[in-house]
Amino acid sequence: MKTSRFSNRCRIVLFVSALFSVLSFCRAEDIVLTSTSATYPYERGQWTAEQCAAWQEEYGPIRGINCPYPPCGAMTQEQAIAYAASLGYNSVRWWPSGGTNADDYIKAVEQWAGWADKYGMTVSPVFGFLQSYFSQSDHASALKNLENQVRKIIRHFRGDKRIILWDLWNEPNLNDDDTKEMMEWITKMVTWCQQEGCTQAITSSLIWDGGVSTNQAAASGGRLLRENVEKLMDVHNYHDYSCQDGFNNETPTMYARLKKISDRPIVCTECMTRTNGSTYARTLIDFAKYNINFYTWGLSACDPNWEVRWSRSTFYNWDPMFHNALYADMEPYNESEPQWVKNYQFQGDFGGAKTGAEYTEIWSSRRAWKWMQHGESKGLYCKTIAEAITKVNTHKRDKLYNTIAVRINYASWASSNSAAKTQFNSLLSAAESAGMTVIPILLTSENLRSNVNTLATYAFNFINEYYYDRRIQAWCILEQTDAIGNEENFKSNLETILRKARYAFQNQPLFCAPLVTEGVMPDSTQTDVANLMWQLSDVCGFSASDASMEFLGRMMKHYHRPIFLLGNNSLTEGMQDNHVNWATAAALPSEDVSNYHFNIFFDNNEDRSSRWPGWKAWRWMNRPPTRGLFFSNISSAISMLEELNGTGSPYNSICVALDFRGYRSSQETFFADLENLLSLAAANGITVLPQLLSDTYFRMSAYALTEYVENVLTRYANDTRILAWDLYNKLSSVNSNPTKAESIIDDLFKTARATGAQQPIFMTPSVSVNTFPSGFDPIASLVHGRYDGWSRLAYGSGSVDLCYRIWCMSDVICYTSSQTSLYLGWLNAQAAKFGRPLFCAEWKVPTSEAPSSTMEIFKDMHISWFANGTLDEEMVREFTYRPVSTQH
């Protein structure tokens, strides 16, 4: 830029011109001119305490979000920002495009600022071009070019209230050979911004070395260099993905560290990672105490693959989601999380606030039902580990039971941790060899006489030791074994234990089991001891010798969660209807145990217009894994079923393409054939997935298509023989008419839902994966932070818009595949971003690869599959899902 002296008159003209530019964005009383410089007439110093307070008061608490990208090309960036605003966010932080071209960068900021402002949001741009300059060999030249770009950007946006702060450098090196020079560059950048009269907060993400011990340590080396530069900033800016560290001591120690540097507003510009327990609830509760502004990371499951932690790949199953607020269909990962954002406010006087989250955050119903994707748990109940090992060995061969609930002797564990752990590990090994999982019962009522903090630490340590162990089915934190004396004291102690136990990130559900006696009834609006225990649990457990049908029905109605019964003496009416998992203390008849299977769960389904909520879709799939065959017509399916004639099959479902032309020719014959198919399938223990339409009928009238769908679904709306409905298979695979295709999607879904069908409704889009380039690693390309996914999909004669539209309207997510396992896995990784049960309605096994490779993906990702052609029967019979287990 030019630095030669101008005449006083010329400077005045420029000053007035720029002042009017500033006034277009802010009020006159907001402008503070402190410069006496002729070269930089707008120069200002670091903000004073009063200016910081005015900034915070004007904008209020920042409820920000990082990089709210759309899930795929079917949604625009503006639409994604609008979604973020609807969740309660009021600011956007991101890395504008443009690189080292100042004009392009300015254009990108203008565009995003315009979108954000339209929805009542501010923006916080990051100078993402820093590394491009710093990586150049000629640092003197690079620094000059950087100065030109920074000054031009700041001048352009001077006075723009849409921008709330500038983040000069995101996460410079913590402590290496480059740290010192990076700090020198940032110091210069602060000066340039001040000289250009930057009216927004100047800050930089220098503090990103979190951890309680780090925050408490004295500053030295690279940390001292960074903290000295931090003193130059208008507001403090830090990153922390470990807010739960030290039982939520991380935030107060970080707060103390920053306030020691200088007393300024604090913004945590990156936070929220669920897999280590740094959830919305835990994080924002403590931020509110300490008046901390925030930006969580990620809006929806999308191509950057932020659903999994650093270095992990979305090619494999995951839960919980690492970053992001929403699934790809823009449904919340957890329905409670948007409320934490919308309701966020500073608490002001936090001097006496306790550290730690007062809120005990439980699993969402969706996650609880997703965990149960293996069918019924039929278990044994034991009071000692020794008894459990004996029973496991007794039933190792008969395969009647698949889990065992066992009391852990707290006294033994407390007195001899090593010996107790050895015994417990022996049980886990024995159970694994018998094909059984374990439900440890950590505490019983008599243990509550011990110190509550000691009990809480014990529960935390136990779960933390085995959090990643797939042999654990669930954790019973407390089994109530006798009457409760002081209820208020009991509730307080229980909450303390659960609160600390949940700091151990668990892959398995936690629950309490109240003793159900006469008069105890589930009611989510009540806070008696039993209902409080259920409200604090991921799944609903209870201890009783039996349970009435009324009790079980109320449990499901009020809590919508899987049910675990401990210590039952019989299998009573209503248990199968309400999907009760149990662990018996009695010697039940073998036939009763063998025949215990969940009945299909039907609701009143009063809502005849909306897609199923996610938890309901997962609850529907609370059954043994679907192992199916695909048939292109009813006659071939009937022939197979007649050949079986009740002799048994390794398959438990079939997908059958129905003949719409046959329906139009003779409805009587059509329904007679369909009824014959359903009857034969039921006689062989097989469910049916009908495919109603395909592109063969694309040119038929809308009336003809909807009348057909309405007639078929109405007739079988409550039929337990139907697994699900595929309304249209591979739409636009050969026909290209986007307008008509969209109309078909909307009309058929509307018609199908109006029938009140009790089974999940979906369509299968035409979607596959383009050929990978030579040497391409699909697993590595889906690692956290790698921008890849939807761009490699192909849609036949359709489009990404049609595929996305279909999956957003479907109760379950379905695709077909004839590609090898790596391609199928890639496609499935995109489908899994919708957070719903996955179906492969037609799997054509490629001749170039053994089916076992794809079967491994089906096991890991919990996919219901239908093979086009028979497979090895033993492989099919042994097919089962692997529990989702996520490391910290």
Predicted regions and their residues:
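Bacterial N-terminal signal peptides that target proteins for export
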Residues: K2-L14
